């Protein structure tokens, strides 16, 4: 029974990893796009429009929730959702942990509620380099609700927690964003800031 449970756990973990890994190539694609680098070096309005349209098309083809590019201060210079009323364009996301990691050259990973849209998502961030120097950050926002829906259809009792013990995915949506263990006051404060 224990061995079967471990296999099930491993299967769920691989399913989550597989879902997220479908999007990990996208920051590299942005790094290769000349207009993205040009925009980060000189944020001219006409260039911004070209990059917005490029990101919109890439987002549509990849089926991610949103793709956006930030300068090194955390300001969104271009976004795939530029046409939407709740567009990220111009937003200051410097407070986000995924941005802070990526601008330092680390992979940024974060599950949270969007500060602009109020919509949950998994964020993958990557520093965009030019001649060995980070000139901006690419962010891919991914929806993972399809995974939860598959668990529900299969009548599985499953959930995934982040490093703080917060449930970020669950076959029972009412469990989402609840903690599996008590949070310290410091952790609560850090999470509120993020």
Would you name each region that the model predicts?
Residues 1-42, 54, 62-65, 107:
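Juxtamembrane extracytoplasmic/periplasmic/luminal helical "stalk" adjacent to the first N-terminal
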Residues 2, 6, 24, 45-48, ...:
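Short, structured helix-loop boundary elements
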Residues 9-19, 65-83, 182-192:
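N-terminal short leaders/motifs
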Residues 38-39, 74-82, 167-171:
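Amphipathic coiled-coil signal-relay and dimerization helices
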Residues 50-61, 92-97, 137-192:
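Solvent-exposed, extracytoplasmic
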Residues 60-63, 73-150:
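Extracytoplasmic/periplasmic ligand-binding sensor regions of membrane-associated signaling proteins
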Residues 66, 122-125, 157, 164:
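Conserved beta-strand and immediately adjacent loop positions that scaffold enzyme active sites
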